[in-house]
Amino acid sequence: LSDRSAVKMGHILGEFFWMLIPNRRKKLALRNIFRGNITKDVKTAEEISKAAAVRFGTIGMSVFRFPLLNKKNISDYVVIQGKEKLDEILASGEGCIIAGNHCGNWELEGAALALYGYPILAVGMKQSNEGFDKFIREYRSIPGQTVEYKTGVRDMLRRLKEGYFVGLLCDQDPGDTGLISPFLGQKTL
């Protein structure tokens, strides 16, 4: 598939899966949009919630295309602003923590960093579906990321000392270990 066809196919897949999302989940998304005072307009809230869900189709298609990415073509897809700072950290050999969230195409971000030559440790959560877990771990490793499940602080410190750029997505549900913090006017975990 061409890039354009892959994006279109991803959007179609996202639209299809949107139809399968239970109405209670869609209503929950609307309530959260209203609670966060993002909009008061029902139609706008519906558009936001649908777009947020449909984009997963495009993200999924980009993961399927990881085998096509390489060091020569990655700059056609991702350009890093502030790359000189990352280069300084890489040259120091000290490693760093890259804190991100599930915004944009986080899967492509990690792949791009690895293809740009940064030693990426993608820290993720084990997926409940064993087959999907195996797939996502394998595909994340194709562009050169090292993938590990959530580990302890000592393990991350060891990886930092080894010079890894430790990627953490900070908007994940921390379970019992999280801190309650304000977000969009609400107390959240």
Question: Could you describe each region identified by the protein language model?
Answer:
Residues L1-G100, K134-Y139, G144:
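Membrane-anchoring hydrophobic helices of lipid-metabolizing enzymes
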Residues F64-L189:
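Soluble catalytic domains of membrane acyltransferases
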